[in-house]
Amino acid sequence: MVKIRLMTINDWKGVEQVWKDHEGTNPVDDCEEGFTRYLKRNPATSFVAVDGDRIIGTILAGHDGRRGFFHHVVVAPEYRKKGIGEDMVKHAMEALEKEGIQKTALVVFEDNDLGNGFWEHIGFTTRPDLVYRNKYVK
């Protein structure tokens, strides 16, 4: 039976495996050091879905004090379409709300039809008035 629980630093190996099995993650950004730093800054807002001892889903969630952010919402292919992603999002939204966060955002690749369909299905809207930009610090 699949259960949703708080993500911990000790989950790194299982989380890393789920991310490696999923397109769209970046080994430069998604290293153990970055994962640990993120969870230390946001200790109560990220969750994993587990089936027995196996991590089969992740939602890395946090905030900057005013806006929540979701990263790497991933469910192993054989577990998709069973409500697990929605359950993880619900847990993360409730955790963010407890910390006083009213709104959350995320980035999805434009050609990720499965991901975009999921977010639309659960009520997330696109912002055609925004352009996403980034730049490496060094």
Regions found by a protein language model. Name each.
Residues 106-115, 134-137:
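Conserved beta-strand-loop-alpha-helix junction that forms the acyl-donor binding cleft
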Residues 2-15:
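A short beta-loop-alpha structural element at the N-terminal edge
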Residues 48, 54-62, 69-74:
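Conserved beta-strand in the GNAT
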Residues 62-71, 80, 126-130:
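A conserved beta-turn-beta hairpin within the catalytic core of GNAT-like acetyltransferases
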Residues 37-48, 69:
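A short helix-loop-beta-strand connector motif used in the catalytic cores of GNAT acetyltransferases and
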Residues 96-108:
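Conserved GNAT acetyl-CoA-binding A-motif
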